[in-house]
């Protein structure tokens, strides 16, 4: 007997099979997603889920027990623990208060106090150590200066931004502080890999991997750079967003020249002024002792040498007495910069004229370091010869004071 087909029943069965396959497919994809998920993210999600369930259960309990809506008092969220402030060897007296007044103007896109607090916290979290060369007996501090000077040259060749260079400098210094017994032949690999990471984070169109390997004259292969990239990021605990020296300086100079608050994110300062002051940062960063001071302090002290104390205090939030140590340390560098004359703005093909000041340039800072050492020796000799520090005025002796006119 022929079997009578029921189209309606077949359609229902087909829909059920399709739905079942869809469920299995979705479940399979979910399993893959769970497998690929970061274990730390999974733990965070579990903690968030437990917290949410606890809060929901508490809210439900309140709704059941409280008869009046006004008795439902929401529990304030717990504030995240702020990192403990880190003391610098020569800057231990400075402490930033979370409620200190922010020098930033009122912002339309964020609370200026929150932005300022976040900037200060980054200077606490990202730690540097100028004594990390003690862990590497085969290395000398001048090797760091040579490497950073070469990275500046690489940045100019590939038209990379200043922020990219200063990110690479921060990655290099913090990574070296986590290592021991690094040999000289590995130093260039660590430096170019730090720049490779920074370029991928900061540049819109970063150079390709083979370009970074090529610029080392094949001393570093592509495989070595990618392997070192993972090592650096792991040892830095994936903390790759510091507030660099040039970031602080950009903020201070922008506050000094701000005219229209709605355009706060657009540079409003003269490029020529920017170039003169940022050259001081390019020079002092070659000295390992710059790691004694927070980046914000270095930027404010550099601004002091090219402006007045009142302006520096207004735009940075620091007091002059708080920066005296860093200001004094920068004197030989500022003397070398001013003796060399004004820097000229460089123009690059394919770079917008409004952005040329942000391109890292190579201005021969390594040669200027020789003048810095000479200036430092001269200043130390003057301080030994005179018991009075330079720049300090003393009142005249009593017998040499001018006598006032009785008629007055």
Swiss-Prot record:
Location in the cell: Nucleus
Cellular component per GO, a single term: nucleus
Compositionally skewed regions (Basic and acidic residues) per UniProt: 398-408
SMART domains per record: CYCLIN, Cyclin_C
Post-translation changes: Phosphorylation by CDK2 triggers its release from CDK2 and degradation via the ubiquitin proteasome pathway.
Family per similarity comment: Belongs to the cyclin family. Cyclin E subfamily.
Segments for region (Disordered): 1-23, 66-86, 385-408
Gene Ontology terms: biological process: cell division; G1/S transition of mitotic cell cycle; positive regulation of G1/S transition of mitotic cell cycle
SUPFAM superfamilies in alphabetical order: Cyclin-like (SSF47954)
InterPro entries documented for this protein: Cyclin, Cyclin-like_dom, Cyclin-like_sf, Cyclin_C-dom, Cyclin_N, Cyclins_cyclin-box
Quaternary organization: Interacts with CDK2 protein kinase to form a serine/threonine kinase holoenzyme complex. The cyclin subunit imparts substrate specificity to the complex.
Residue stretches spanning the membrane: none
Keywords: Cell cycle, Cell division, Cyclin, Nucleus, Phosphoprotein
Pfam family, one: Cyclin_C
Modified residues (Phosphothreonine): 394
Job description of the protein: Essential for the control of the cell cycle at the G1/S (start) transition.
PROSITE patterns: CYCLINS
Encoding gene (name): cyce3
Protein name listed in UniProt: G1/S-specific cyclin-E3
């Amino acid at each position: 007997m022929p079997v009578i087909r029921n189209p309606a029943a077949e359609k229902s069965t087909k829909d059920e099979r399709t739905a079942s396959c869809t469920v299995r497919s979705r479940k399979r994809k979910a399993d893959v997603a769970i497998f690929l998920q970061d274990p730390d993210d999974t733990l965070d999600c579990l903690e968030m889920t437990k917290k949410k369930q606890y809060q929901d259960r508490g809210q439900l309990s309140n709704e059941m027990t409280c008869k009046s809506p006004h008795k439902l008092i929401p529990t304030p969220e717990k504030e995240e623990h702020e990192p403990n402030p880190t003391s610098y060897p020569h800057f231990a007296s400075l402490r930033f208060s979370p409620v200190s007044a922010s020098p930033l103007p009122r912002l339309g896109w964020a609370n200026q106090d929150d932005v300022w607090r976040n900037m200060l916290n980054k200077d606490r979290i990202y730690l540097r150590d100028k004594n990390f060369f003690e862990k590497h007996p085969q290395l000398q501090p001048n090797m760091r200066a040579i490497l950073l000077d070469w990275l500046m040259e690489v940045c100019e060749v590939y038209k990379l931004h200043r922020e990219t260079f200063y990110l690479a400098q921060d990655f290099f210094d913090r990574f070296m502080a986590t290592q021991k017994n690094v040999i000289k032949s590995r130093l260039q690999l660590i430096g170019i890999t730090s720049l490779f990471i920074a370029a991928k984070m900061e540049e819109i169109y970063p150079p390709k991997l083979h370009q970074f390997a090529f610029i080392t004259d094949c001393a570093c292969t592509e495989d070595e750079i990618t392997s070192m990239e993972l090592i650096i990021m792991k040892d830095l605990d994936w903390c790759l967003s510091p507030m660099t020296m040039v970031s602080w300086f950009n903020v201070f100079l922008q506050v000094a020249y701000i005219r229209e608050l709605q355009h706060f994110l657009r540079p409003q300062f003269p490029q020529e002024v920017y170039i003169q002051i940022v050259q001081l940062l390019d020079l002092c960063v070659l000295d390992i002792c710059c790691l004694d001071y927070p980046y914000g302090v270095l930027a404010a002290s550099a601004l002091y040498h090219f402006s007045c104390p009142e302006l520096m205090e207004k735009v940075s939030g620091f007091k002059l007495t708080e920066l005296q140590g860093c200001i004094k340390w920068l004197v030989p560098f500022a003397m070398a910069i001013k003796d060399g004359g004004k820097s000229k703005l460089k123009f690059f093909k394919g770079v917008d004229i409004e952005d040329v000041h942000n391109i890292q340039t190579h201005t021969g800072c390594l040669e200027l370091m020789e003048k810095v050492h000479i200036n430092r020796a001269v200043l130390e000799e003057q301080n030994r010869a005179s018991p009075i520090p330079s720049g300090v005025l003393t009142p005249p002796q009593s017998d040499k004071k001018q006598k006032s006119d009785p008629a007055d």
